[in-house]
């Protein structure tokens, strides 16, 4: 029994000792000086390609570390003195002597005497269990110098057992994983978890956004419990989702290697670390472990007025179809984001009338407190004369990449104030819906202003009897896509007013199918099948779209197929074409349609041989490794051959996200009297009307009316020039990504990716009673420039790499209808012109003394134009139309 007790006592003692050893942290010996060599290297480049000529620099030095004080109660809490000496700054890339900006420059001439002295001044590190708990340095030292010291201190971060934990070093507070063996520790930092002091922003849509991939690993070699070497490799890759070859790479390396151990200073006595630090140097103070923000100082940089003078000629209306317009827009945007309210107002008040709309686009797109305040003071919404500028401001708000609650509150204030133009009043409310959605997407749905606007829009349609105001609120809800609005939209979908029904149903079509409840499905089925009353054809067609795109049941699909043959003549052809398009383009409902078509009652020759001119067709605009772009064209005619609805959509898909890039809808009604024809059932009393509606980058814009009423129609017909009516024109900030990447070395990389689009969308409608012909056109002109740059500015040296691409393109959609005989001839054309495409990359290094090295390269190509293929029936019709015209 005694032997057993003794054995248990020995085992317990051994386990306790082992546990103590496992939990102990690394320690430095007393009276020892550990002499290390250290280097921190930065390289900037694209992810692939040669490293020759890449911008970057290397800072190398000696680092002496010694134990100053050890907590008598906690042996693993140690105060270390760290001193950097023999500093060298040189190029990290392979440069010829001619292109090496560091050649012939001393460290003091590069850093400056004050910075060099500060860098070589000793600092203190509180090291506990291998973790940096605090760092002590002189408060007055430059931020860049303190950050470099933080980078050196972070090399000591380690632990002697494996595990995961949140810990802070120079680059932020991150989840870190350790894998420890007797002689080696591998420290892997999960950079996607890091919380830093500087918050950036990014575009709400992943399709237009930027993707990042980062990695950080430290390999520490131990000898007798002392760090023999530590090597860090950290990479950050940022790429534009729409074109991943437009990408940048930040490579940061650090190395700490033990050279020798010498006799060092004796340990200082003291009870606590604060007292010991103060006794050593009363100028020491705790400065934190994480790198601090460095205020950029730009000597000789142009101010806002200088920038505006340099770019304004490129922003005149005649230049908007050229790539120089969005390029100048982005240059101006960067300057605006640094400018004060007073500077911005000065430029606004001294701008020509022709360039002012483009300046308003840029000021609003800047999305700073100063720019928003300046533009709101500049615009007077009580005056009708400023309609163009006011609408450009509102559209720029709608396209905002990262809107704030302040911007939404500003629009709410405008809507509640005096507004001179009813069109502007409509646009304000419609755009508030777009801002509401973007704020909710980034988790800000419960902010006070957001809640207030949400309540306003949900109550809006029922709060007024004015038709235009009801449409305004419904369009705002179409932008907002609030889940709470689904029942309200379903209610208005069954309205007796066709415009209400169309807006409500097309809004429901934009929702995630998960939110289309069984009750809503019953509603759209009632509308399509006219179970309770007769609806206009375009309303029924929109209802069919919702049915087929919202995870339909077998019976829903079967009933849609069975309806073909019992619809108005042109709608029969439209629905048949719609079903065939689902099959051909393999849409989500494709398999269910195939299953239903096995039933011969649903699928027979009589049903699938309906003739007419209406059609629906989908196709690919572009298919690349980065993005898939698709289009669809739907066109519905009345039985008399007059256009009822033309709908063109363009979508972009990337990174598992979908962007509704463009929708242009032309609607017409009540035009049968022009050709002495009979209106279709349910449309006999419709007022003559034609208009155009556009949705651009997920934002529904205010519809444009061509004419309304018979008298307006006749006056427009006799005065119509055939020139298209502008729907939207201006400069849009598509991509907008900004972030600061704090590196473990203490350096800070600033990343800015912006994409600017100059766009001009117009549409027109022409009638010729003499030739019994009508023509509708949608013209899209645009120039796109996307630029991404990453810079590291250390006050004493800066390095940067910039990538980008640009293009100019046009896309026209023309529909010609000849209704001199029946069946009437319809020709649809969708043409893309040959357009240029350019990719660019530039690199730069610069010293404050003025020495600069830079390179620029570009690659140009011409992308051939094409006419997008539609169905064979359309091709046959176009031949007949042009043969007759000839």
From Swiss-Prot:
Keywords: Disulfide bond, Endoplasmic reticulum, Lipid transport, Signal, Transport. It is found in: Endoplasmic reticulum. Its main location: endoplasmic reticulum. Residues 1-24 form the signal peptide. The keyword Membrane does not apply. Disulfide bonds join 174-194, 440-445. GO terms for molecular function: ceramide 1-phosphate transfer activity; lipid binding; protein heterodimerization activity. GO terms for cellular component: basolateral plasma membrane; endoplasmic reticulum; Golgi apparatus. Catalyzes the transport of triglyceride, cholesteryl ester, and phospholipid between phospholipid surfaces. Required for the secretion of plasma lipoproteins that contain apolipoprotein B. This is Microsomal triglyceride transfer protein.
């Amino acid at each position: 029994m005694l032997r057993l007790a003794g054995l248990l006592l020995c085992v317990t003692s051994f386990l306790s000792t082992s546990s103590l050893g496992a939990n102990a942290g690394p320690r430095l010996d007393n009276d020892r000086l550990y002499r290390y060599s250290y280097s921190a290297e930065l390289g900037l480049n694209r992810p692939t390609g040669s490293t020759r000529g890449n911008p970057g620099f290397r800072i190398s030095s000696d680092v002496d570390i010694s134990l100053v004080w050890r907590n008598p109660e906690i042996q693993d809490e140690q105060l270390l003195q760290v001193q950097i000496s023999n500093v060298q700054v040189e190029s990290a890339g392979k440069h010829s002597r001619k292109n090496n900006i560091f050649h012939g420059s001393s460290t003091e001439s590069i850093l400056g005497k004050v910075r060099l002295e500060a860098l070589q001044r000793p600092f203190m590190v509180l090291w506990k269990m291998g973790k940096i708990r605090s760092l002590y340095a002189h408060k007055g030292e430059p931020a860049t110098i303190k950050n470099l010291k933080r980078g050196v201190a972070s090399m000591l971060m380690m632990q002697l057992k494996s595990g995961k934990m949140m810990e802070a070093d120079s680059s932020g507070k991150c989840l870190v994983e350790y894998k420890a063996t007797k002689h080696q520790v591998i420290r892997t930092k999960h950079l996607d978890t890091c919380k830093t002091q500087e918050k950036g922003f990014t575009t709400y849509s992943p399709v237009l956004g930027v993707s990042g991939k980062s990695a950080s690993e430290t390999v520490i070699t131990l000898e007798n419990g002392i760090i023999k070497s530590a090597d860090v490799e950290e990479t950050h890759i940022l790429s534009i989702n729409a074109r991943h070859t437009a990408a940048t790479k930040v490579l940061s390396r650090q190395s700490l290697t033990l050279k020798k151990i010498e006799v060092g200073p004796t340990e200082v006595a003291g009870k606590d670390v604060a007292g010991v630090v103060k006794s050593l140097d009363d100028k020491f103070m705790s400065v934190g472990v994480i790198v601090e923000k460095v205020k950029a100082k730009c000597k000789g940089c142009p101010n806002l007025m200088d920038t505006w003078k340099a770019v304004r000629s490129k922003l005149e209306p005649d230049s908007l179809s050229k790539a120089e317009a969005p390029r100048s827009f982005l240059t101006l945007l960067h300057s605006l984001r640094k400018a004060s309210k007073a500077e911005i107002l000065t430029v606004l008040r001294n701008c020509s009338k022709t360039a002012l709309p483009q300046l308003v686009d840029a000021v609003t797109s800047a999305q700073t407190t100063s720019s928003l305040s300046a533009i709101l003071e500049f615009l007077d919404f009580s005056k009708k004369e400023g309609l163009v500028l006011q609408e450009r401001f509102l559209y720029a708000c709608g396209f905002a990449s990262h809107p704030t609650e302040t911007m939404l509150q500003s629009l709410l204030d405008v809507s509640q104030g005096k507004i001179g133009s009813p069109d502007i009043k409509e646009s304000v409310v419609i755009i508030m819906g777009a801002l509401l959605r973007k704020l909710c997407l980034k988790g800000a749905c419960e902010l006070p202003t957001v809640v207030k606007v949400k309540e306003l829009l949900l109550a809006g349609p029922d709060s007024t009897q004015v038709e235009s105001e009801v449409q305004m609120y419904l369009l705002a809800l179409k932008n907002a896509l609030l889940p709470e609005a689904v029942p309200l939209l379903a209610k208005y979908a069954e309205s007796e007013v066709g415009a209400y029904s169309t807006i409500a149903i097309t809004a429901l079509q934009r929702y995630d199918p998960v939110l289309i409840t069984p009750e809503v499905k019953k509603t759209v089925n009632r509308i399509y099948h006219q179970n309770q009353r007769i609806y206009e054809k375009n309303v029924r067609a929109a209802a069919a779209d919702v049915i087929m795109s919202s995870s339909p049941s077998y019976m829903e699909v079967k009933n849609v197929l069975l309806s073909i043959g019992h619809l108005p003549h042109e709608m029969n052809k439209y629905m048949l074409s719609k079903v065939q398009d689902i099959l051909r383009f393999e849409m989500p409902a494709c398999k269910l349609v195939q299953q239903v078509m096995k039933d011969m009652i649903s699928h027979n020759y009589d049903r699938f041989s309906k003739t007419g001119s209406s059609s629906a067709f989908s196709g690919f605009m572009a298919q690349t490794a980065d993005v898939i772009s698709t289009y669809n064209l739907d066109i519905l005619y009345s039985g008399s051959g007059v256009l009822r609805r033309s709908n063109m959509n363009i979508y972009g898909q990337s990174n598992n996200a979908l962007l509704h890039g463009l929708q242009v809808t032309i609607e017409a009604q009540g035009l049968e009297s022009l050709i002495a024809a009979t209106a279709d059932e349910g449309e006999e009393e419709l007022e003559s009307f034609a208009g155009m509606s556009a949705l651009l980058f997920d934002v529904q814009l205010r519809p444009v009316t061509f004419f309304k009423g018979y008298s307006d129609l006749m006056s427009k017909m006799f005065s119509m020039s055939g020139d298209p009516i502008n729907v939207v024109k201006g400069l849009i900030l598509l991509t907008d990504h900004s972030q600061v990447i704090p590196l473990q070395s203490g350096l800070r990389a600033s990343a800015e990716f912006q994409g600017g689009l100059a766009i001009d969308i117009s549409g027109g409608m022409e009638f010729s009673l003499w030739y019994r012909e009508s023509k509708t056109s949608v013209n899209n002109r645009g120039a796109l420039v996307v630029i991404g740059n990453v810079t590291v500015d250390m006050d004493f040296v800066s390095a940067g790499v910039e990538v980008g691409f640009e293009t100019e393109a046009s896309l026209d959609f023309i529909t010609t209808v000849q209704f001199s005989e029946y069946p009437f001839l319809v020709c649809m054309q969708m043409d893309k012109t040959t357009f240029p495409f350019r990719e660019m990359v530039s690199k730069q290094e610069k010293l404050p003394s003025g020495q600069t090295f830079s390179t620029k390269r570009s690659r140009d190509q011409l992308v051939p134009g094409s006419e997008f293929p539609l169905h064979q029936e359309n091709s046959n019709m176009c031949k007949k139309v042009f043969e007759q015209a000839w």
